[in-house]
Amino acid sequence: MVHTTSPLLLLLLLSLALVAPSLSARKCSLTGKWTNNLGSIMTIRAVNSRGEFTGTYLTAVADNPGNITLSPLLGIQHKRASQPTFGFTVHWNFSESTTVFTGQCFIDRNGKEVLKTMWLLRSSVNDISYDWKATRVGYNNFTRLCTVEE
C-alpha cells in the first residue's frame, strides 16, 4: 500500500515551518506608553542590562481626583524570557500612598502586547487600629499606546 501526500498539505506544512519561528521569536517589551482599562497612562523608559527601569504613571482614578499629578515609578523585569514577568512601585506624588504592581508582558493571539497585572495600594492611616482598611488589591490590563524612542 502506497501513501501519497497532497501537494497542498506539503505547502501548508512548509509555510508553518517558515512562519512559526518568527512568531515565537517576538519578544514582549515593557518600554513605551501604555493605558489600562481605567484610562490611566503609564510610560516606561528603556530597560537597562540588569532589567531595571523607570517611568511615570498618571492615574485616572483617586480618592481626590482634583489632586492627581504625574508620579514616578521604579521597577525590574526578567530579561531572558520572551514574555517577561516584572514588578514596579509607584510613589504617588499627590497622596501618602504607594502602589506595587506585579505582572507579565504577553503577546496575544493577534500579535498585540498586553501587560496583565495585579496591584496592592497601601494608604497611610493615622492609627494601627485602622490598618485593616489601609491596603487595597486589584488588577489592571494595559495595552500599548506607542513605543518610546530609546
Swiss-Prot record:
Residues reported to bind biotin: N36, S40, Y57, T59, D63, S95, N140
Keyword Glycoprotein attached: yes
Chain ranges of the Avidin-like domain: 26-147
Residue pairs linked by disulfide bridges in the UniProt entry: C28-C105
Molecular function (Gene Ontology), one example: biotin binding
Gene Ontology CC: one annotated term: extracellular region
Recorded family membership: Belongs to the avidin/streptavidin family.
Free-text function comment from the UniProt entry: Forms a strong non-covalent specific complex with biotin.
Other facts: The sequences of the coding regions of genes AVR4 and AVR5 are identical.
Name this protein carries in UniProt: Avidin-related protein 4/5
